């Protein structure tokens, strides 16, 4: 219980923290983790989905016979679309390796190792941006009787981590694109 009179500002703060910060951060963290697992363990060791694949499943379902599955795949397809839209360099890299090597499974070891070496340090940030750190921050701010502090942590600290992680991953993908194109030049 608190004697603070919450005005409209707390709802604005919560909306910004939840919709503009938390949701995109978790989405991209999940995507980067699945990408890392895909390059580490292959398709079987990852849940790396894409918009076209999920949309095809959605289109194949009947609203009448499978309403919950249809709703699920509609949301999942849009979730994937949002992840793909925010990762243009990864999308270019992934498309390039599909074209040149017929998929990541046939990627030369040097390029795969370079990607994993650059991706591995980013996994700590994906972990920070998922549930545990947020839960601890929320519980601590509530126990200290300053629950609005959690919202500020979400908007400031977590957003800075998200921006850094995103920038590093896109730069890594650009490096990998350069490695693929250099390898092509050497082979010609």
Regions found by a protein language model. Give the residues of each.
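Multi-pass membrane catalytic core of lipid/isoprenoid biosynthesis enzymes
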Residues: 1-26, 138, 143
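C-terminal membrane-associated helical module and adjoining short loops/tails
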Residues: 21-22, 31-188
